[in-house]
Amino acid sequence: MNIRPLHDRVIVKRSEVESKSAGGIVLTGSAAEQSSRGEVLAVGNGRILENGSVQPLDVKVGDIVIFNEGYGVKKEKIDGEEVLILSESDLMAVVS
């Protein structure tokens, strides 16, 4: 994938969600939730602070993150894959 996010932006590929319920029923449409987890594909250089210095991001390529898909999250298709472009502040946790 040939994309480089700017500043404190992160490119995330959403993880696939299990499309079956606990009882084995296949879920479709709105019953099948979208995952709020994904893999970090690319990170920007960092957040620019008031004094002009750059604070590096806490996440790195390959991290599995839990994110808040709220205002400011941009969905894009890059090389045929849907990815999310979001700010590091939209990330809630790194799964280890």
Swiss-Prot record:
Keyword Chaperone in annotation: yes
Intracellular or extracellular location(s): Cytoplasm
InterPro entries reported for this sequence: Chaperonin_GroES (IPR020818), Chaperonin_GroES_sf (IPR037124), Chaprnonin_Cpn10_CS (IPR018369), GroES-like_sf (IPR011032)
GO cellular component: cytoplasm
Signal peptide positions (record): none
GO biological process: chaperone cofactor-dependent protein refolding
GO molecular function: ATP binding; metal ion binding; protein folding chaperone; protein-folding chaperone binding; unfolded protein binding
Any matching Pfam family: Cpn10
Keywords from the UniProt entry: Chaperone, Cytoplasm
Functional summary from the UniProt entry: Together with the chaperonin GroEL, plays an essential role in assisting protein folding. The GroEL-GroES system forms a nano-cage that allows encapsulation of the non-native substrate proteins and provides a physical environment optimized to promote and accelerate protein folding. GroES binds to the apical surface of the GroEL ring, thereby capping the opening of the GroEL channel.
Subunit structure: Heptamer of 7 subunits arranged in a ring. Interacts with the chaperonin GroEL.
Family (UniProt): Belongs to the GroES chaperonin family.
Protein name: Co-chaperonin GroES
Lineage: Bacteria, Pseudomonadati, Pseudomonadota, Gammaproteobacteria, Alteromonadales
